[in-house]
């Protein structure tokens, strides 16, 4: 079964969409009220394979014993903490989905992710907030296989 990490999980919307296809989903979110809402939402939706942890992604990653098969990233405007990126890359998952609300943060983080062996396979911009300057960008990242794999 698939273990999914949903980092910066908010109220758990993405985690709950992925839950039926996964064996287990772990959501990490710094806003405690959002984590409480995520737990209630999962319960209401009858999902028993979701765990939500309140805390900073940078610190929580050090405490997780599970090994993810897929990582979903949906960070705030400032993007992913520079010290968290190497920890995320180190998991070596085949695929990551990065959902960004600020293209410049995404561009900065992609440089690090690409240096860590990931390639952006597909990028899709979504105008979630018409008539504003805001744009959501969804990026599918794939781990590049080394010559001996």
Where on the chain are the PLM-derived regions?
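Rossmann-like S-adenosyl-L-methionine
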Residues: 1-149
């Amino acid at each position: 079964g698939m273990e999914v990490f949903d980092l910066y999980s908010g109220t758990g919307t993405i985690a709950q969409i992925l839950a039926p296809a996964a064996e287990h989903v772990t959501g990490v979110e710094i806003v405690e009220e959002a984590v409480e809402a995520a737990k209630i939402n999962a319960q209401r939706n009858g999902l028993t394979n979701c765990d939500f942890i309140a805390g900073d992604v940078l610190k929580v990653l050090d405490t997780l014993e599970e090994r993810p098969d897929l990582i979903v990233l949906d960070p705030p405007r400032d993007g992913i903490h520079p010290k968290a990126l190497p920890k995320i890359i180190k998991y070596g998952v085949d695929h990551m989905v990065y959902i960004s609300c600020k293209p410049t943060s995404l561009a900065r983080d992609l440089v690090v992710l690409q240096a860590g062996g990931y390639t952006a396979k597909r990028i899709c911009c979504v105008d979630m907030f018409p008539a504003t300057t805001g744009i959501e960008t969804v990026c599918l990242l794939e781990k590049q296989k080394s010559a001996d794999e």
